[in-house]
Amino acid sequence: MIEGHGDDLYRYDNIKMNFSSNIYNGTDLSALNAYLCTRLDAIRTYPEPSAASLEQMIALECGISPDEVLVTSGAVDAIYLIAQTYRHEGTCHILQPTFREYEDACRVFGYQESEDGALCWLCNPNNPTGDVLAAEDVLALAERHRLLIVDQSYEDYTVAPLLRPADVVGRDNVILLHSMTKRYAVPGLRLGYVTASSAIISRLREQYRPWAINALSLEAGKWLVQRGVTAIPDLPSYLAETQRLRAMLNEVEGIEAHDTLTNFFLCTIRQTTAARLKEYLAHEHGILIRDASNFTGLTPHHFRIATQSPAENDALVAAIMNYVLN
């Protein structure tokens, strides 16, 4: 799905506040920027064919073996790699509404949707709803499918307990997806990784393209893992701000801000469509939200927002209130 993702900032010239991406925009990346400026000569040579040095660092951090980790060019790269590798299984089940790339990747490789499909795709925490499925319920899904893929890209944006890599590497049918893009707020670098049993990782490597991770992304990834600083230094406060924002939006007539266990959540607007609200906010206030109508199972009235700073959140509520009242 090239079109239809959030964070379509490139379509607009005047955006000052971006609620469209689920990533927090206030992260200070100046130290990373300075480091990368010292590593620009890395582009003169080919990078490692398989990002092995970064995989070793991630394995150490997770308490697992390097042969149980596969670094990819973002979580989406992993999604298509998994769909390609297991394409002969033929059937899949996707828990909806959720991230569209599971559906698109399965369509590309000829899967048929079936409730008891061989592959089961789960986003946990779920995009776009912000729901979190308990770990025991996730593992129960693994009992009903040949392979369970759990996308934990937003694991750093919730305090709810989730599966850890060490919980799944001993299982022969569970894959976890992780997003360094989300963890460190670096979407332009395209970095993610898979954790699973060594047998699953070995099978994925058979379809893995060489030099999938460019030299600067590899340098950045190692620098970020070594320092271990995530995008949100005070997650409880950030999630409390999310609930404050939800409460304010629920006071606006015609707006319903749905429950969430993450920093992002769905809203519905009764009076108009999400697409119209999005265009109004973008052109009149320089605010970008996510029209969520293209998620399977949602309606033209659904939109998604991700919490930003208190001042930006107040500005968003005021702008939506102005639209509703006028």
Identify the residue ranges that each predicted region occupies:
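N-terminal "arm"/small-domain region of PLP-dependent enzymes with the aminotransferase-like
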Residues: 1-45
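Short, conserved charged micro-motifs
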Residues: 30, 272-279, 311-315
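Conserved beta-loop-alpha segment that forms the PLP phosphate-binding cup at the N-terminus of a helix
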Residues: 51-55, 65-89
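Conserved PLP-anchoring active-site segment centered on the Schiff-base-forming lysine
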Residues: 73, 85-107, 112
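Active-site phosphate-binding strand-loop segment of PLP-dependent enzymes
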Residues: 107, 114-161
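Conserved PLP-binding catalytic core of the aspartate aminotransferase-like
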Residues: 239, 252-285
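PLP-dependent enzyme catalytic core of the Aspartate aminotransferase-like
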Residues: 283-284, 297-326
